[in-house]
Structure formats: C-alpha cells, structure tokens
Amino acid sequence: IGDIWSGIQG
C-alpha cells in the first residue's frame, strides 16, 4: 500500500 504502517512499499 505504502502507508504509515507498512512504510513505503508495504
């Protein structure tokens, strides 16, 4: 996804 939780590429 690339949100706060998963960082950039999560």
From Swiss-Prot:
Its main location: secreted. It is found in: Secreted. One of its GO terms (cellular component) is extracellular region. The keyword Secreted applies. Expressed by the venom gland. The keyword GTP-binding does not apply. Keywords: Secreted. This is Venom peptide 3. It comes from Brotheas amazonicus.
